[in-house]
Amino acid sequence: MIQEAIARLLGDNDLDRTTAHGVMEQIMTGGATDAQIGGFLVALRCKGETVDEITGFAEVMRAKATPITGGREPLVDTCGTGGDGSGTFNISTTVAFVVAGAGCTVAKHGNRAMSSKCGSADVLAELGVNVEASPETVGKCLDEAGIGFMFAPALHGAMKHAIGPRKELGTRTVFNVLGPLTNPAGARRQLIGVFASHLTETMAGVLGALGSERAFVVHGSDGLDEITLTGPSQV
């Protein structure tokens, strides 16, 4: 299926939700080679991702994630796409502590740096946090501390098939977009920063299709995948 999908993308044709679902299933079950995965990611980025494509991918990733239970509802996540190339500190992780301190339960989803200098897991590991804590421990953190960190590689085991191609490409791909959409705790209230202005409406459409309750999708006019302090921000 992935070969046919690559051909469609190279012809500047969108994939429907069912096809996107099938391709991600093939990737996450080890049915695609590294070359096919890399080719697919580049072709998709060149064409541009649609709501249906991202929704189909996210549905598969959510279904295959190790679930996290715990914490007082509603759960909140502050997870940006990364990939803005700005070299700023990891703002979403700092925000997670502020939000938790304000009384919200924060189920923070994140990873090590893939296309940026510093990911959420890198920051927390330097602070002495066990970023690879068991699902039970993360759930206990949500219950007792009101904040827990969910390390994407530990909870999205099927993603192992895409790690190599992503790292070798060294550039942002649809997986940057998918990270904030596949929270293992099922957080339905989110603040998501995106690396490109056109993604604000696309991501909002995907969140609606996936059943989110409340969400802000933001992009700074200076290119940040955050609300910026140097000019207007798109929300």
Where would I find each of the regions flagged by the language model?
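Acidic, glycine/proline-rich low-complexity segments that act as flexible tails and inter-domain linkers
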Residues: 1-87, 102
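Electropositive phosphate-/nucleotide-binding environments in soluble metabolic enzymes
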Residues: 3, 14-21, 31-38, 48-55, ...
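Glycine-rich anion-binding loops and their surrounding alpha/beta cores
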Residues: 8, 14-15, 63-68, 88-89, ...
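Short glycine-rich loop/turn motifs that provide flexible caps or phosphate-binding loops at active sites
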Residues: 11, 29, 47, 79-82, ...
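Short beta-strand segments at enzyme active-site cores
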Residues: 36-37, 106-109, 217
